[in-house]
Amino acid sequence: MAAAALRRFWSRRRAEAGDAVVAKPGVWARLGSWARALLRDYAEACRDASAEARARPGRAAVYVGLLGGAAACFTLAPSEGAFEEALLEASGTLLLLAPATRNRESEAFVQRLLWLRGRGRLRYVNLGLCSLVYEAPFDAQASLYQARCRYLQPRWTDFPGRVLDVGFVGRWWVLGAWMRDCDINDDEFLHLPAHLRVVGPQQLHSETNERLFDEKYKPVVLTDDQVDQALWEEQVLQKEKKDRLALSQAHSLVQAEAPR
């Protein structure tokens, strides 16, 4: 009787275990359930965001604008090749200028960048929204102890002083600022009085000068009165010239006959 009870208990446990094995879902079923739950959560989040945007359109527009601006900045962040092109273009621009007309500060900044570039001490880093070019103490391939020891590396507190240029929305702003007046040499105006060394915006007449320069090549159009006046003046000048010639001839004849 005890043996029969044990057999019944054992058979019942095996049946329950078999039902549990059959009822347990597989890997793909669990992945499908997880994907459906994830999509359901995202759908609810999108519905909530849409409802919030309809309730507060101003805030939604600000968020969309910020996201769009961040995406544009991320896309337009200049690359290392863009900095190389800008540096070579700036160097070529200075070479086309006469040494006496080059801005000393612009030339010194570009020469420093070229010097660091030639020694492999320029570093480029992309921060997503913008790019940075900074100065390194050694070449990346240098094997010196000072270059490899991590205890001798520059401090992060000194990093702002080593930044050379900032790239944002497709431009390198520091290099562009130095090259803005690259063809103006302030040393040329040191001999001038103090009030003539600085020119204000109201004192510039470049547009007027350019217009007058172009007008000097245009044909002169004269009216009939101006033509008559010019002809009369020409006749008067010719008459005066003839009179002076006659007087000079008479004077020479008088001087020739005087000794006789």
UniProtKB/Swiss-Prot annotation:
Record carries keyword Nucleotide-binding: no
Stretches in topological domain Mitochondrial intermembrane:
78-260
* KW Magnesium (keyword) present: no
The cellular component terms of Gene Ontology attached to this UniProt record, alphabetical and capped at eight, are: mitochondrial inner membrane; mitochondrial intermembrane space; mitochondrion; TIM22 mitochondrial import inner membrane insertion complex
Q: From the record, give the transmembrane residue ranges.
A: 60-77
Compartments, record wording: Mitochondrion inner membrane
Q: Which residues lie on this side of the membrane: Mitochondrial matrix?
A: 32-59
Q: Which InterPro entries match?
A: TIMM29
Transit peptide from where to where? 1-31
Tell me which UniProt keywords the record has, alphabetically: Membrane, Mitochondrion, Mitochondrion inner membrane, Protein transport, Transit peptide, Translocation, Transmembrane, Transmembrane helix, Transport
Q: Which GO terms describe its biological process?
A: protein insertion into mitochondrial inner membrane
Give one Pfam hit by family name. Answer: Tim29
**MF terms in GO:** protein transporter activity
Kindly report the protein's main subcellular placement as a broad class.
mitochondrion
Membrane topology annotation: Single-pass membrane protein
What quaternary arrangement does the UniProt entry report? Component of the TIM22 complex, which core is composed of TIMM22, associated with TIMM10 (TIMM10A and/or TIMM10B), TIMM9, AGK and TIMM29. Interacts with TIMM10B; the interaction is direct. Interacts with TOMM40; linking the TIM22 complex to the TOM complex. Interacts with TIMM22 (when oxidized); the interaction is direct.
What the protein does comes down to:
Component of the TIM22 complex, a complex that mediates the import and insertion of multi-pass transmembrane proteins into the mitochondrial inner membrane. The TIM22 complex forms a twin-pore translocase that uses the membrane potential as the external driving force. Required for the stability of the TIM22 complex and functions in the assembly of the TIMM22 protein into the TIM22 complex. May facilitate cooperation between TIM22 and TOM complexes by interacting with TOMM40.
Q: What is this protein called?
A: Mitochondrial import inner membrane translocase subunit Tim29
What species does this protein belong to? Homo sapiens
Gene (name only) = TIMM29
